[in-house]
């Protein structure tokens, strides 16, 4: 988040309130010790920095009523950032106050209802058009990989060349969102394209090299590839890179995979998260029947609704 001045909002907050630099350092230490997500931390810090710049003080130096009035103003302002940004502001302040050992009862931050919006799914025709849109082989491979294995953006940029096992046709996802490794199938169709990509690009260590300090690609870069590719198609749906993961899950359900297996493939912590795809998957309905008929293969075409 970089303002017209050329300084990020965090840099502006530190310049205005120098003590905020110690806060950033303390938050970073806590997230590292707890093994929590760095991307979530960065979102929290940016939102807390906005609050610091607005008031010119650290959050614990601000009257709780002032903070709540500020949040109400943000929620009502049509020019305010997205609901996701607002949530990061609230969650970030909660995390900050817990870290400072402040009384929860003194800070009546709003409780946020979870979004019940159903995921937007791309159909097979749209997916084929999307995968054919990028000019660069690297970009075509990236988009196809996300859909083929249902990966999160962070999981894609974390992939190393050694995580791809062409012989066993598997992809090793290491330390994903919930710090758990998992193995997902490598599409045979994608495998041949990956080999061509590796031969042409000759990446080192990371499967997708980029301009990040450690040499890997960035999630922002992935999102840019998705946006630019969408522009080259006739797709009018409001989709993002994560829509490819949604499409993967929905299409697997429609192809008959059971929801427990899908949960493991997606790396969800709870099956409740996975169950949202039951609302968008167009699975064929089967009439109630006796298992005895299946036992003796006594079925009729009328079984299907």
Residue positions per predicted region:
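Conserved catalytic core of the tyrosine transesterase superfamily
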Residues: 1-305
């Amino acid at each position: 988040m970089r303002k017209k001045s050329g300084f990020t909002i965090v840099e502006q907050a530190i310049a205005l309130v120098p003590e905020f630099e110690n806060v950033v350092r303390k938050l970073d230490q806590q997230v590292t010790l707890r093994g929590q997500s760095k991307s979530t931390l960065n979102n929290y810090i940016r939102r807390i920095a906005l609050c610091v710049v607005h008031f010119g003080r650290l959050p614990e130096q601000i009257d709780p009523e002032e903070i709540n009035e500020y949040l109400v103003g943000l929620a009502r302002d049509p020019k305010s950032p997205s609901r996701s940004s607002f949530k990061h502001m609230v969650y970030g302040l909660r995390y900050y106050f817990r870290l400072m050992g402040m009384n929860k009862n003194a800070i009546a931050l709003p409780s946020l209802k979870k979004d019940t919006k159903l995921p937007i799914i791309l159909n097979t025709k749209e997916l084929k058009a999307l995968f054919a849109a990028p000019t660069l082989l690297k970009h075509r491979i990236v988009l196809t990989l996300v859909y083929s294995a249902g990966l999160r953006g962070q999981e894609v940029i974390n992939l190393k060349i050694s995580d791809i096992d062409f012989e066993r046709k598997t992809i090793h996802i290491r330390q994903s969102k919930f710090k758990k490794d998992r193995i997902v199938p490598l599409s045979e169709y994608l495998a041949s394209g990956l080999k061509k990509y590796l031969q042409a690009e000759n990446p080192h260590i990371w499967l997708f090299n980029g301009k990040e300090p450690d040499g890997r690609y960035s999630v922002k870069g992935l999102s840019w590839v998705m946006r630019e590719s969408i522009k080259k198609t006739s797709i009018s749906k409001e989709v993002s890179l994560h829509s490819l993961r949604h499409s993967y899950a929905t299409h697997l359900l429609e192809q008959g995979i059971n929801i427990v297996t899908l949960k493991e493939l997606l790396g969800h912590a709870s099956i409740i998260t996975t169950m949202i795809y039951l609302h968008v998957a167009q699975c064929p309905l089967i009439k109630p029947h006796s298992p005895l008929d299946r036992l003796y293969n006594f079925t009729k075409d009328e079984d299907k609704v």
